[in-house]
């Protein structure tokens, strides 16, 4: 008997970018594909959304350069607060040094802006499949 898990539900995604028009566009695109999406316009606001209930989101999609708290520090603090979800860094032309900074943070993908929506949706769909498979293995 298979057990229904929460990952058979649409992914719960938090998108973070200080470019409000872009983050709204990304959120709307993900919602079109059935994902449940919230967004924040800076790292500090995102951390406020994550910290009280770190299990609320399955996926964090973050920019790198943002006011108050950059993408790297957001991931560090989110992990420290108990966030165990997947992470995609969606940022403009990261330097090799910035890419290296994300190396030890269990980041599933780094996508350079500008990217077409198919690339982002493809990575999100792959991560959802991984979560489904992991949930099924855990339930077995």
Segments from the language model and where they lie:
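Receiver (REC) domain active-site loop signature in two-component systems and cognate sites
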Residues: 66
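Non-catalytic signal-transmission and effector/linker regions of two-component phosphorelay proteins
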Residues: 1-14, 24-27, 116-140
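Acidic, metal-coordinating helix/loop segments flanking the phosphotransfer/catalytic sites
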Residues: 39-59
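Active-site residues of response regulator receiver
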Residues: 63, 91
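Two-component/phosphorelay signaling modules centered on CheY-like receiver
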Residues: 20-38
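A Lys-centered signature of the CheY-like receiver
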Residues: 112-113
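Conserved phosphotransfer cores of two-component systems
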Residues: 51-55, 77-84, 105
């Amino acid at each position: 008997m298979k057990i229904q898990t929460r990952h058979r539900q649409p992914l719960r995604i938090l998108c973070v970018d200080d470019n409000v028009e872009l983050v709204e566009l990304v959120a709307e695109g993900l919602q079109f594909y059935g994902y449940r999406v919230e967004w924040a316009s800076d790292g500090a606001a995102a951390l406020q959304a994550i910290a009280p209930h770190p299990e609320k989101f399955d996926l964090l999609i973050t920019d790198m350069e943002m006011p108050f708290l950059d993408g790297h520090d957001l991931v560090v603090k989110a992990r420290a607060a108990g966030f165990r979800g997947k992470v995609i860094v969606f940022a403009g032309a990261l330097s090799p040094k910035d890419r290296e900074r994300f190396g030890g943070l269990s980041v599933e993908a780094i996508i350079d802006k500008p990217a077409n929506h198919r690339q982002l949706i493809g990575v999100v769909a792959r991560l959802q499949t991984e979560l489904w498979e992991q949930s099924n293995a855990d339930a077995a």
